[in-house]
């Protein structure tokens, strides 16, 4: 009875709203991920699971930690549809997100997208990246999605260099403004620790 009520509330409020869950390839071998797949499918929740497969779970390559190449297929045993896309390409990611949104809104069921991408830097500031070669990183930098988007805008959409520079300046300003706002803001009250956290 409670689950029917919860689902009714969710569907009433989420006709155009979808919960998004982001996880890395390293998390895909954790049991709670399969529990989440099971419940999302069982309760027909409007959830979009997004796997950022950057080939390394912290310092362990995907080939050494997971059997099988298609991580999104692990959700299919729970009846969750999904796909794998080139996560280094803005347009394929955008198209996949639109397909996922439409599927979830039309079927009231979860969906999963595996984004095949890459992490250029270490997992943290203390990660010296000794588990991969500089050649590997440099090769992947050749298809850096930011640089590829810049090239696409210049060549295919005929953007001017000045326009690109203005966009880059605007983005840098936004980042600095957010950083300043964050540093200037007071720390939250300890009472807020569990606000909107549901156990």
PLM regions and their residue ranges:
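Glycine-rich ThDP/TPP pyrophosphate-binding loop and its adjacent helix/strand module
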Residues: 1-184
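C-terminal intrinsically disordered, low-complexity extensions immediately downstream
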Residues: 184-199
């Amino acid at each position: 009875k409670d689950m029917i009520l919860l689902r009714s509330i969710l569907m009433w409020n989420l006709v155009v709203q979808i919960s998004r869950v982001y996880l890395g390839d390293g998390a895909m071998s954790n049991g709670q991920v399969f529990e989440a797949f099971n419940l999302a499918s069982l309760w027909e929740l409007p959830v979009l699971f997004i796997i950022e497969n950057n080939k390394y779970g912290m310092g362990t390559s995907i080939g050494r930690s997971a059997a099988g190449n298609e991580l999104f297929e692990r959700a299919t045993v729970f009846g969750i549809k999904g796909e794998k896309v080139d996560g280094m390409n803005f347009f394929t990611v955008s198209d996949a997100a639109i397909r996922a949104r439409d599927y979830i809104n039309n079927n009231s069921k979860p969906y999963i997208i595996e984004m095949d991408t890459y992490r250029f830097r270490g997992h943290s500031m203390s990660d010296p990246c000794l588990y991969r070669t500089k050649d590997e990183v440099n090769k992947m930098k050749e298809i850096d999605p930011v640089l590829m988007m810049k090239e696409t805008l210049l060549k295919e959409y005929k953007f001017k260099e000045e326009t690109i520079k203005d966009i880059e300046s605007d983005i840098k300003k936004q980042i600095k403004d957010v950083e300043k706002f964050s540093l200037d803001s007071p720390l939250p009250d300890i009472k807020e620790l569990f606000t909107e956290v549901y156990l």
